A protein has these predicted regions:
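Conserved HGGG/HGGXW glycine-rich cap/lid loop of the alpha/beta-hydrolase fold
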Residues: 2-41
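Active-site loop/oxyanion-hole signature of alpha/beta-hydrolase fold enzymes
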Residues: 30-59, 95-96
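Histidine-bearing beta->alpha loop at or near hydrolase active sites
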Residues: 37-39, 186-190
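Gly/Ala-rich beta-loop-alpha elbow adjacent to hydrolase catalytic centers
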Residues: 61-66, 70
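Flexible "cap/lid" loop of the alpha/beta hydrolase fold
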Residues: 76-111, 115, 145, 166, ...
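Active-site nucleophile elbow and catalytic-triad environment of alpha/beta-hydrolase enzymes
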Residues: 133-153
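Short beta-strand/loop motif that positions the catalytic acidic residue
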Residues: 157-159
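Conserved loop-alpha-helix segment in the C-terminal half of the alpha/beta-hydrolase fold
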Residues: 161-186, 193, 205-206
Length: 207
């Protein structure tokens, strides 16, 4: 049995990992899904990491923007799932051309304006029922500065090959350039919604 700590990305919360957590629990693992204060202005990935706390005995998974957080967390293994990796120029280079549709409020927090836009921009490979359910729970995301390292040897990148947000080629090239292990998953940006069983099998293989 292993302990998994699943760290969400922008706009989401620990709720997004519900089905994945059930699958991992069925494998006999312990799972934590913390909620980060993504709406609070002025925080950094270091603040998020302090809220999660050191996890020296856990496999810590960061999805999407959560990759910048887990880089700062002591862990048995760090796993980057369709994630922004803590390297130079991440915001300029990581995203798929044309990704977007979110807007910003007067404080600079980004949000998805309606369910149709979220379905097209964030969840194109999800069912409409899945995307509507997720949209109803999304929060606003305060600006978050990019951070670098540590990243590389001992880390695992689960590259989501049909990702419409974080470019899969960038995920793979960046991981290889820094000596991280690459596992390719034929999935979109949110496989915890679309392929929770298959994703749990990948994580179980790391336990």
């Amino acid at each position: 049995m292993a302990r998994f700590v699943l760290v969400h990305g922008a706009w989401h919360g620990g709720w997004c990992f519900g089905r994945l957590a059930e699958e991992l629990t069925a494998h006999g693992h312990e799972v934590a899904t913390p909620d980060l204060p993504c709406e609070e202005i002025g925080l950094t990935p270091f603040d998020y990491a302090r809220l999660v706390g050191p996890q020296p005995d856990a496999i810590v998974v960061g999805h999407s923007l959560g990759g910048l957080t887990i880089a700062q967390i002591e862990a048995r293994v760090r796993v980057y799932l369709g994630a922004l990796l803590p390297v130079e120029n991440v915001y300029a280079e990581a995203f798929v051309d044309g990704f977007g549709g979110f807007t910003r409020d007067h404080d600079g927090r980004s949000y998805w304006p309606d369910a149709d836009t979220a379905a097209a921009g964030m969840y194109p490979d999800c069912s409409r029922a899945q995307s509507d359910w997720a949209f109803a729970q999304l929060r606003r995301q305060a600006p978050l500065d990019a951070v670098t390292g540590p990243f590389g040897d001992g880390d695992v990148v689960v590259a989501t090959l049909r990702d419409g947000a974080v470019d899969s080629g960038w995920q793979i090239r960046t991981a290889q350039a820094h000596g991280a292990r690459v596992i390719e998953l034929d999935a979109g940006h949110s496989p915890f919604f679309t392929q929770p069983g298959e994703l749990a099998d990948v994580f179980n293989s790391l336990a």
